[in-house]
Structures are given as structure tokens and as C-alpha cells.
């Protein structure tokens, strides 16, 4: 029995090295050995097998509502951020307007008023405006300084206009044509019984519209024609009409110096041509000569928050008629302080062409001045051009209260060859009376003021007064038609959007010339109302 225990112990001792060797040295990877190894590991990772992860249930978070607190304390900004976003501004669109307008009126003394205007919007860049106007009177007037003698007077003016504009990207092209006709008669016992003025003109020009461009320009050309039918102090003579043709060319070039300064050179040339009853056929003396004027106006402008300056000069040249060279200032200075108070001063001048159009605007009943010598009795001549040597003034504007403005000013004006007119009674030379244009050098000092008040576009009130003290060196009687006191008063009431009411009064008194005449003052009271439907 003891031998059995010995044999068993030897067998156990012989088997122990092989077991230890199996644990330290793994055999070739096989399915059997992999299974054995796995069974000997704790919490093994099984390769080539799918795992299923089970997550615990998660509860959804809840948010507790709290009262929002805003910062209401003001802090002064010491600097503006460089990348500040600009505010959005919507595109302004003008409300649509009615393209056409028609007005017709008739009153006592045969007063006629007709006006028609229509704007054709051919496209977004093309516009055509057509206008027709006729006004006048035909009635019996009582002549002054007579025993109720009547004058069967008539005066009709007709105007027709066509204006076309095409808008390019930075330029506007404008082409226009105008026609005018004036028919009227003179008072009884005048040297002429009637008169007719016929006018027409053609215009073509381009206008640079980009105000931000460093260099911009404008240019235009005009052909103006005008005829006075009767120009002799005896209308029974045939072919006394005089035709005036003006070829006018204008242009300017502007160069910007930054955002606040610019320099401009403006040029205007007028070529005046005359034909018809312009010379004495028997002697060959010519009283209407063709001539050319050249007007040059260079100036500098400054425009900022406080100052507005315009500094330039008017250089006027004439070739073939009148004085060959003249120069006058073109200066304006304006200083703004406290946003609503303005102190200003200006000195301007320049040539005023006394062409046939200006003669009609001053006095349509005036005859052209007679030629100087008695040998040319019955012939007329062209007046010299008026030249404003200086018109200087200083003034002060202020708005102490919203909507309220007032302006006080004073100045001095000097005119060379100032155009006026005077009356002549029948004489041994002319059997009838007439008005004739005449000229002299004049000057005047003036003072004035104006005030206006506007309340919320409901009520507007304005008043203006100007006093002038005239002086003439040689022909004082020409001052009889000059205004001494000018006053105007206007009230505008706009109670509702469609209703407008206007009330106004104008007063003009003339200078009294001793031992000659004093014209009656002009008093004009007018009232009107309009309602838009």
C-alpha cells in the first residue's frame, strides 16, 4: 500500500512541469485554444462577436422662467466703433401726379385766360412736354386826362412750347422749341395804330447730372428769332419790319476740389444779326449793325457748415457795337451761426442784352429810339446794352422761432445805359403821341426787409417792403417810371389737403420828377381759391 503512494507521488511530480509550460507558452491560435483561454479570463473581450450597449433612461431637462432685466442706465459714448453698421433707408418714391392740366377763364373787358399743358412719359428716360397759353383783353377803356374818351383796346398774347428730355446715365439731353405772338393796338392819336411781335426759338443742350463727379460740364446752343412789324413813326410806310436773329452758345466746366470746394468757368457767346428796315436806302447809313458779345464768368465756391462763398468776376467783351470791354464783380459771402442766423454780403453785376425780347418785357408799347440826326428822320436804331456795374448789398437773416423768418438788407446799384421810356406829345415833327425807349446812367440806394411765418403747412403769412432812392446824372425825367416804394403782403390758408385760399396785396409808387410828371401808384388787391378734386 505504501508502494502505491510512492508511485502516485512520482506520477504527480512528473506531470507538474507540463502544466506550467501550458500556462506560460501559448500554442498556435486555434479555435480550441481560444476557447480555453477565454474561459480562463475574467470579464473577457470576445472578438468577432456583437455587443449590445444598454444606456440608462435620461430625463429631459426643464428650464425655469425668470424675469428679463434690461439695462436702462445711460453711458456717454467716448468713441464710435469703426465698423458701425449704417441705418437702412428706404428708396423715396414720389407720388404719382396728373400729367395734364387745363385752365380756361373769361372776364370783363374781354379778359381771356387759356392754358393747357400735358406731359407725355414716353418711357422711364424720355419725357415730352407740350404747352399752349393764350391771354389778353378786348374792351373799351377810359382814357386819362380826357372827358371820358374811350379807347377800344385789345392785347392778345399766344405762346406754344414743346420740350423733350432724354436721360442718359450721367447726362440729360434737352431739345425744345418755342413760339410767341403778340397783337395789340395803341391809344387814339398815336403815331402808329397797331403792332405785332412774332418770336420763335430752338434750343438743344446737354446737362451733366452726376453731382459727385470730380469734373462735370453743361453745354447748349440756341437759335432765337424775333420780328417787330412796325418800326417807323408812320405805319403807312411799307416794309418797316425789323428781324432780329440771335445765335447763343453757352457752356460751363466745373472741377471739384474735395467735397466742399469747386472751380467753374462759364462762357456765353451771342451773335446778333439784323435785317429788314435797318438802314437808310438813300444814304446807306446803317442803324442796326451785326455784332458779337462774349461773356466770361470764372468763379470759386466754398460750401461747408458755416461758410458759403462764391468769388468770381464777370468779364464782358463786345465786337462791332457798344463798349468793347467791361468787368464787374461776382461775389457772395454768407456766414451761418447757431443754425438759424445768417449774415451775408454780395456784389454782382454784368451785361443785360437789350434785345427785342427785353424791350417787350419792359414796355411793349415803346417805340425804338430815333436815329440821332435830322437827316435820318423816321429811322430808328437799336438801344445800347445795359451794364450793371455793381449791385452790392449786406443783410441779416434770422429764425428766432420755428417757422418764423425775417430778413433786413440794404445796398447800392449802379447801371450804365439804364433802359427806360418816356412819353412824347404830338408836335410839328410827329403828328401823334408815342412812347419811346431812352437811356441814361442811373444809380440808387435801397433799404428793405421781409418777414414770413409758416404754421404746419396750414397757414402762411409773408410781407416785404423795399425803398429806393434814384438818381440820374443828365436825364432825370427818365426816373419817372422808376419804383420808389414796393410793398407786398400775402396770406396762404390750407385748411384741408384739397383746399387752398390765397389773399394778396401789391403796392408800387413811382418817383416824382419835378416839372415833369408823377405816375399814379399801382394798387393790386387779389384773392383766390382752388380745390383739387
What are these regions (language model features)?
Residues 116-120, 160-166, 202-210, 249-255, ...:
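Residues on the lipid-exposed face of transmembrane beta-strands in outer-membrane beta-barrel proteins
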Residues 20-92:
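N-terminal periplasmic/intermembrane-space "pro-region" immediately following the signal or transit peptide
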Residues 97, 102, 308, 316-320, ...:
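Exposed, low-structure sequence patches enriched in small/polar residues
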Amino acid at each position: 500500500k505504501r508502494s502505491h503512494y510512492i508511485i502516485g507521488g512520482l506520477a504527480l511530480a512528473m506531470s507538474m512541469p507540463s502544466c506550467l509550460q501550458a500556462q506560460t507558452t501559448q500554442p498556435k491560435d486555434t479555435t480550441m485554444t481560444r476557447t480555453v483561454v477565454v474561459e480562463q479570463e475574467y470579464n473577457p473581450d470576445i472578438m468577432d462577436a456583437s455587443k449590445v450597449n444598454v444606456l440608462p433612461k435620461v430625463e429631459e431637462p426643464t428650464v425655469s422662467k425668470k424675469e428679463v432685466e434690461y439695462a436702462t442706465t445711460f453711458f456717454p459714448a467716448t468713441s464710435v466703433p469703426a465698423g458701425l453698421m449704417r441705418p437702412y433707408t428706404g428708396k423715396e418714391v414720389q407720388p404719382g401726379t396728373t400729367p395734364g392740366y387745363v385752365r380756361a377763364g373769361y372776364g370783363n373787358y374781354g379778359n381771356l385766360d387759356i392754358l393747357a399743358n400735358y406731359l407725355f412719359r414716353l418711357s422711364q428716360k424720355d419725357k415730352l412736354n407740350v404747352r399752349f397759353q393764350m391771354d389778353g383783353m378786348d374792351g373799351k377803356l377810359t382814357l386819362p386826362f380826357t372827358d371820358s374818351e374811350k379807347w377800344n383796346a385789345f392785347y392778345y398774347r399766344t405762346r406754344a412750347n414743346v420740350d423733350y428730355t432724354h436721360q442718359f446715365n450721367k447726362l440729360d439731353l434737352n431739345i425744345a422749341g418755342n413760339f410767341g405772338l403778340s397783337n395789340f393796338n395803341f391809344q387814339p392819336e398815336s403815331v402808329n395804330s397797331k403792332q405785332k411781335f412774332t418770336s420763335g426759338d430752338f434750343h438743344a443742350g446737354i446737362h451733366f447730372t452726376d453731382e459727385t463727379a470730380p469734373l462735370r460740364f453743361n453745354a447748349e446752343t440756341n437759335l432765337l428769332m424775333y420780328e417787330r412789324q412796325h418800326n417807323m413813326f408812320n405805319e403807312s410806310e411799307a416794309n418797316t419790319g425789323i428781324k432780329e436773329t440771335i445765335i447763343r452758345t453757352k457752356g460751363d466746366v466745373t472741377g471739384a476740389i474735395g467735397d466742399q470746394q469747386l472751380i467753374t468757368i462759364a462762357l456765353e457767346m451771342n451773335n446778333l444779326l439784323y435785317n429788314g428796315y435797318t438802314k437808310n436806302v438813300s444814304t446807306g447809313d446803317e442803324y442796326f449793325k451785326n455784332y458779337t458779345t462774349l461773356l466770361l464768368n470764372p468763379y470759386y465756391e466754398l460750401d461747408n457748415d458755416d461758410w458759403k462763398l462764391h468769388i468770381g468776376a464777370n468779364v464782358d467783351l463786345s465786337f462791332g457795337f457798344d463798349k468793347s470791354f467791361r468787368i464787374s464783380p461776382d461775389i457772395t459771402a454768407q456766414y451761418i451761426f447757431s443754425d438759424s442766423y445768417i449774415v451775408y454780403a454780395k456784389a454782382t453785376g454784368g451785361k443785360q442784352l437789350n434785345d427785342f425780347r427785353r424791350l417787350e418785357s419792359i414796355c411793349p408799347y415803346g417805340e425804338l429810339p430815333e436815329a440821332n440826326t435830322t437827316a435820318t428822320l423816321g429811322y430808328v436804331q437799336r438801344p445800347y446794352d445795359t451794364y450793371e456795374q455793381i449791385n452790392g448789398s449786406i443783410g441779416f437773416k434770422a429764425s428766432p422761432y420755428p417757422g418764423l423768418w425775417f430778413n433786413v438788407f440794404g445796398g447800392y446799384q449802379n447801371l450804365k445805359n439804364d433802359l427806360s421810356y418816356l412819353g412824347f406829345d404830338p408836335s410839328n415833327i410827329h403828328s401823334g403821341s408815342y412812347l419811346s425807349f431812352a437811356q441814361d446812367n442811373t444809380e440808387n440806394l435801397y433799404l428793405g426787409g421781409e418777414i414770413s411765418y409758416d404754421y404746419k403747412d396750414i397757414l402762411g403769412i409773408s410781407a416785404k417792403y423795399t425803398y429806393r432812392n434814384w438818381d440820374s446824372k443828365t436825364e432825370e425825367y427818365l426816373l419817372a417810371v422808376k419804383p420808389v416804394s414796393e410793398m407786398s403782403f400775402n396770406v396762404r390758408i390750407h385748411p384741408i389737403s384739397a383746399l387752398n385760399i390765397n389773399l394778396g396785396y401789391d403796392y408800387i409808387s413811382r418817383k416824382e420828377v419835378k416839372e415833369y410828371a408823377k405816375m399814379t401808384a399801382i394798387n393790386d388787391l387779389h384773392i383766390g381759391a382752388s380745390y383739387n378734386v
